[in-house]
Amino acid sequence: MGRSLKKGPFVAGHLMEKIEKLNAQGSKQVIKTWSRASTIIPDMVGHTIAVHNGKQHVPVYVSEQMVGHKLGEFAPTRTFRGHAKSDKKAGRK
């Protein structure tokens, strides 16, 4: 079940303030954020937002196709290093 249309999309207040400030200035600089739950809105298009993945900030360039998704979707928190290899020599007798 999605969020109510009456409420509108969730965007962290501090992140929204930074976006509005940069849009007013017309500058494009990297914005660091820990708010992975914030929804990408049209005002964010063209900005680079560094989203925290638990270890570091991953730079995410926001395009029009990303509008409506969450910031956390574009900064994976887990790294897949492959399945464990089986030791076939130990099984022989």
Curated annotation (Swiss-Prot):
One of its GO terms (cellular component) is cytoplasm. Pfam families: Ribosomal_S19. It comes from the Bacteria. Transmembrane segments: none annotated. GO terms for molecular function: rRNA binding; structural constituent of ribosome. Coiled coil: none annotated. One of its GO terms (biological process) is translation. InterPro entries: Ribosomal_uS19, Ribosomal_uS19_bac-type, Ribosomal_uS19_CS, Ribosomal_uS19_SF. Disulfide bonds: none annotated. Keywords: Ribonucleoprotein, Ribosomal protein, RNA-binding, rRNA-binding. Belongs to the universal ribosomal protein uS19 family. HAMAP family: Ribosomal_uS19. Protein S19 forms a complex with S13 that binds strongly to the 16S ribosomal RNA. NCBIfam families: rpsS_bact. This is Small ribosomal subunit protein uS19.
